[in-house]
Amino acid sequence: MDRTETRFRKRGQIKGKITTSRQPHPQNEQSPQRSTSGYSLQEVVDDEVLGSSAPGVDPSPPCRSLGWKRKKEWSDESEEEPEKELAPEPEETWVVEMLCGLKMKLKQQRVSPILPEHHKDFNSQLAPGVDPSPPHRSFCWKRKREWWDESEESLEEEPRKVLAPEPEEIWVVEMLCGLKMKLKRRRVSLVLPEHHEAFNRLLEDPVIKRFLAWDKDLRVSDKYLLAMVIAYFSRAGLPSWQYQRIHFFLALYLANDMEEDDEDPKQNIFYFLYGKTRSRIPLVRNRRFQLCRCMNPRARKNRSQIALFQKLRFQFFCSMSGRAWVSREELEEIQAYDPEHWVWARDRARLS
């Protein structure tokens, strides 16, 4: 009995050891067990078929948000766009600066990358149809735009005026001494024979004849001022047959503005142009008489005519592109076209 009891007790102890060894340890549950197949745990998980996840588990990746997704799409689109070609750097070339016998001096010059198509694009942006205004458009801008459209239509209806070309400059020989030559820059005059013919035709006008006969002191119409009239005819750009009496007095008035300091003598042009003389207008300083005269409809008409003359004078000045100054050489060249003309005898130096 004792031997059998001891055997059963030993067997019970062995079974207890086996059962205790098979119970899972809390630390061993958390640590992953090695697979009996010899593969790592990561490889076994990748081979498993994904099923429905647990209700509390988020299947989305942890660090991917909506902003990251948009950023990724934007980066993909930017990679697909072709790269813009940058403008080439300006090249430099060597040009001949001076050549003396067999010696040659070179100079490094940069080639400009500007092409004619760039000028065309720039000029197209300056066309009247281009809108240079900012995007914020107000009511005042709308009125201004409507006025601009109306002015464009009126300009299209009216024929465009052809302005006179700018005078060119040439080099002429002033002095020649042996192998040395002295050059002088000279401006080519734009005065043509047709301008002289238009001037001579206007001298036959009875009003202009009367005006020149009245100016005995040559304070308004000496030979230089009359030569400036011909120069202005060449710069205004009108055909010779279009010059009338008003153009003669406009040019003469503008010539007096440029050369004379006294303002009173040229005011007589108004009275000869509109059929009156200076002697018919009384010079009375009585304010009451002047007030009654201002209320006279004839006086108001005279003021409106003078205002119209000043407006035409400004238009005539603009038609010459503001080139109202005439050099002494050009005036002498105009007089040399027909030196025997009776107009060139109107010299102030002979009167004194």
UniProtKB/Swiss-Prot annotation:
Coiled coil: none annotated. Pfam families: Spy1. Residues 76-90 have a biased composition (Acidic residues). The gene is SPDYE16. InterPro entries: Speedy. Residues 18-40 have a biased composition (Polar residues). Belongs to the Speedy/Ringo family. Residues 1-90 are annotated as: Disordered. It comes from the Eukaryota. GO terms for molecular function: protein kinase binding. This is Speedy protein E16.
